[in-house]
Amino acid sequence: MANKPSAEELKKNLSDMQFYVTQNHGTEPPFTGRLLHNKRDGVYHCLICDAPLFHSQTKYDSGCGWPSFYEPVSEESIRYIKDLSHGVQRIEIRCGNCDAHLGHVFPDGPQPTGERYCVNSASLRFTDGENGEEING
């Protein structure tokens, strides 16, 4: 795991929602994330450590209210944790580099993987592939 900033530093540099999601395994309200409807070509990075997580070509509209992807950029980019909270068994996904909470993965996505990586916008930074503009979720 990469060295990540201290909690004090993160609180100073992140919005309350970004801190809640990435550091406290929180979930932003559905259909509120800044990157939900982003359709530009580029790469989605971890907001905390800037590690690449998802290519825009793997993003799709699942209708669930959060950005959804069917495949990460690499196996190492995502860490998978069994999540038994809320009386349901799910698989939590975290950044493979800094361990920031991203969301969950479900086995109901499209082909070719059949997986839906349901990710909080607040855990992501998008970099536009054409002009390099960065947008924090």
From Swiss-Prot:
Enzyme's top EC category: oxidoreductase
EC number(s) on file: 1.8.4.12
Alphabetical list of Pfam families matching this protein: SelR
Essential cofactor(s): Zn(2+)
GO CC terms of this entry: cytoplasm
Cofactor note: Binds 1 zinc ion per subunit. The zinc ion is important for the structural integrity of the protein.
Reaction catalyzed: L-methionyl-[protein] + [thioredoxin]-disulfide + H2O = L-methionyl-(R)-S-oxide-[protein] + [thioredoxin]-dithiol
Binding annotation for Zn(2+): C46, C49, C95, C98
Keywords: Metal-binding, Oxidoreductase, Zinc
GO molecular function, one term: zinc ion binding
MsrB domain boundaries: 7-129
Listed GO biological process terms: protein repair; response to oxidative stress
Active site positions: C118 (nucleophile)
Lineage top rank: taxon: Bacteria
SUPFAM superfamilies tied to this protein: Mss4-like (SSF51316)
Family: Belongs to the MsrB Met sulfoxide reductase family.
Name of protein: Peptide methionine sulfoxide reductase MsrB
